[in-house]
């Protein structure tokens, strides 16, 4: 109020305006205070109602707890009576269990004695087990030796297959050389259709020498690397190309058959060697079946026997014999049997 009284106004109107603003300010403050008072009164009434409701709930809960306390006291008295009865029964049961315990101790002593006997028997079994393990290691060592020998036999079989593939490769080379020779002969063909007998004999000798080139045998380590496997498609293509060539002379056919016969004799010697090795391995380990080696050898042997027995009867073999003569393939000859490298042996025969 002192600050308000110390204000100096220039005119009465300014003082009136000032006091009006002050009056409005205090009026709004009083209205806000009255509103807060009303809100406080309403909140206090609500809080008082809530407290009364909580008081009623607590009083009801107190009554419930009092009745529950009385019930629990009665239950406690009943439990005490049951406890006394159970205590007497447990005392009788403990006495009987003590008797059972004494009997159980006697049984335990007997079982400990039996366990000692079992330990002695276990020691004997362990000694027998060690002896069995030693014998088993010896047997495994012999079995590994037999497996190594089987691997050697399989490598020999692979060598045999490589020999057959080398025969096919030589025939392919002969076909290529024959085609080159035919091209050269066409280029150098004389004007006259009738050549001299010396020129014909020279061409025949050249064809015989070029048709089947000699293939020296290489060691096993070099032979596996030098021989290349032909796919069924290339093998079939080479057969189809070879049927359209010019026929060889009898000398060339005889030399080719001689080379093929030498290869077959070598293959037969290799098979006999493999058979002897198989018998030796079978004697060393009779309980282990040599499925892979024996199956291959039996399959090869049966194939050779069938080819030897059917060499003169089937139309397929007639067509293959004409293949050695570099003639044309008959139209009724099926080509299905010659789509894989296993058909090389049929071509050899």
UniProtKB/Swiss-Prot annotation:
It comes from the Eukaryota. Its main location: cytoplasm. Keywords: Cell cycle, Cell division, Centromere, Chromosome, Coiled coil, Cytoplasm, Cytoplasmic vesicle, Cytoskeleton, Kinetochore, Membrane, Microtubule, Mitosis, Phosphoprotein. This is Nuclear distribution protein nudE homolog 1. The lineage of its organism: Eukaryota, Metazoa, Chordata, Craniata, Vertebrata. It is found in: Cytoplasm, Cytoskeleton; Cytoplasm, Cytoskeleton, Microtubule organizing center, Centrosome; Cytoplasm, Cytoskeleton, Spindle; Chromosome, Centromere, Kinetochore. Phosphorylated in mitosis. It comes from Xenopus tropicalis (Western clawed frog). GO terms for biological process: cell division; centrosome duplication. Transmembrane segments: none annotated. Residues 23-189 form a coiled coil. The keyword Cell wall biogenesis/degradation does not apply. Residues 182-201 are annotated as: Disordered. GO terms for cellular component: cleavage furrow; cytoplasmic vesicle membrane; microtubule; spindle pole centrosome. Required for centrosome duplication and formation and function of the mitotic spindle. GO terms for molecular function: microtubule binding. InterPro entries: NUDE, NUDE_dom. Belongs to the nudE family.
């Amino acid at each position: 109020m002192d600050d308000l009284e110390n204000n100096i106004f220039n005119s009465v109107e300014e003082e009136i305006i000032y006091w009006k603003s002050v009056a409005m300010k205090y009026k709004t403050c009083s209205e806000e205070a009255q509103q807060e008072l009303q809100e406080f009164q309403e909140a206090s009434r609500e809080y008082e109602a809530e407290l009364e409701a909580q008081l009623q709930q607590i009083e009801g809960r107190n009554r419930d707890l009092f009745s529950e306390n009385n019930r629990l006291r009665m239950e406690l008295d009943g439990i005490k009576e049951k406890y006394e009865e159970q205590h007497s029964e447990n005392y009788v049961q403990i006495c009987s269990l003590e008797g059972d315990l004494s009997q159980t101790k006697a049984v335990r002593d007997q079982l400990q004695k039996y366990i000692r006997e079992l330990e002695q028997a276990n020691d004997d079994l362990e000694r027998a087990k060690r002896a069995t393990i030693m014998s088993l290691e010896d047997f495994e060592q012999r079995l590994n030796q037999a497996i190594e020998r089987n691997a050697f036999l399989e490598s020999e079989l692979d060598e045999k297959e490589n020999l057959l593939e080398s025969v096919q490769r030589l025939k392919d080379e002969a076909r290529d050389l024959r085609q080159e020779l035919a091209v050269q002969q066409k280029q150098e063909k004389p004007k006259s259709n009738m050549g001299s007998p010396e020129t014909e004999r020279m061409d025949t000798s050249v064809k015989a020498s070029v048709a089947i080139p000699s293939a020296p045998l290489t060691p096993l380590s070099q032979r596996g690397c030098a021989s290349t496997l032909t796919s069924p498609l290339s093998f079939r293509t080479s057969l189809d190309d070879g049927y359209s060539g010019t026929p060889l002379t009898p000398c060339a056919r005889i030399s080719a058959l001689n080379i093929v016969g030498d290869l077959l004799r070598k293959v037969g010697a290799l098979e006999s060697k493999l058979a002897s090795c198989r018998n030796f391995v079978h004697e060393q380990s009779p309980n282990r079946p040599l499925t892979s080696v024996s199956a291959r050898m039996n399959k090869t042997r049966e194939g050779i026997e069938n080819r030897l027995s059917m060499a003169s009867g089937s139309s397929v073999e007639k067509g293959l014999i004409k293949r050695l003569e570099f003639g044309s393939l008959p139209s009724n000859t099926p080509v299905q049997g010659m789509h894989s490298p296993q058909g090389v042996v049929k071509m050899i025969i």
